[in-house]
Structure formats: structure tokens, C-alpha cells
């Protein structure tokens, strides 16, 4: 009986983690004022990409953890507004 109860508790926690709690990520570009967005259901990471061009260092923030081209730095994280 104790084993069944423990299994039920673990399954409940896992299901709540999958369904609950959308991530909030910063989504401002370069030197713009801070803005945030609530990510789509199931998206649990934020990213910050940065690169240099003729305008200087540029940055982009958002939800997820995209692949990047060579020369672009990417940082991914998994707490709210961790990509500021």
C-alpha cells in the first residue's frame, strides 16, 4: 500500500511539472528596455544570443534554446527571466 501511494505521489509531481508553469523569458533586443514574454506551454528554457557586426555587439533573447551559426554566442538557462 505504501509503495502504491509513493508511486501515485511521484506520478502526480511529474505530471504537474509537465503541465504547469510556463516559463517567462526576457525578449528585448540589444540595448532596448527590458521586456518579457510568457513562453508557449511546455517550453522550459530561455536563451540569449550575441554577436558582433558593423553596429557593434548585438543581442537577441527569447524562449527555447535555438541552434546558432558559427560566430554567434548562445546561452540557455531554465529559470524565469534568467536570460536578461
From Swiss-Prot:
UniProt keyword list: Acetylcholine receptor inhibiting toxin, Disulfide bond, Ion channel impairing toxin, Neurotoxin, Postsynaptic neurotoxin, Secreted, Signal, Toxin
Main subcellular location: secreted
GO MF term set: acetylcholine receptor inhibitor activity; ion channel regulator activity; toxin activity
Keyword Secreted: yes
Pfam families per record: Toxin_cobra-type
Expression across tissues: Expressed by the venom gland.
Signal peptide bounds: 1-21
Domain of life: Eukaryota
Recorded GO CC terms: extracellular region
Location in or out of the cell: Secreted
Keyword Secreted: yes
Disulfide bonds: 25-46, 39-63, 65-76, 77-82
Function: Binds to muscle nicotinic acetylcholine receptor (nAChR) and inhibit acetylcholine from binding to the receptor, thereby impairing neuromuscular transmission.
Family assignment from sequence similarity: Belongs to the three-finger toxin family. Short-chain subfamily. Type I alpha-neurotoxin sub-subfamily.
Protein name per Swiss-Prot or TrEMBL: Short neurotoxin SNTX-1
Organism: Demansia vestigiata (Lesser black whip snake)
Amino acid at each position: 500500500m505504501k509503495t502504491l501511494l509513493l508511486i501515485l505521489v511521484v506520478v502526480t509531481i511529474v505530471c504537474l511539472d509537465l503541465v504547469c508553469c510556463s516559463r517567462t523569458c526576457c525578449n528585448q533586443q540589444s540595448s532596448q528596455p527590458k521586456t518579457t514574454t510568457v513562453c508557449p506551454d511546455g517550453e522550459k528554457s530561455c536563451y540569449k544570443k550575441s554577436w558582433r557586426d558593423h553596429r557593434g555587439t548585438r543581442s537577441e533573447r527569447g524562449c527555447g534554446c535555438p541552434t546558432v551559426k558559427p560566430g554567434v554566442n548562445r546561452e540557455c538557462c531554465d529559470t524565469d527571466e534568467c536570460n536578461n
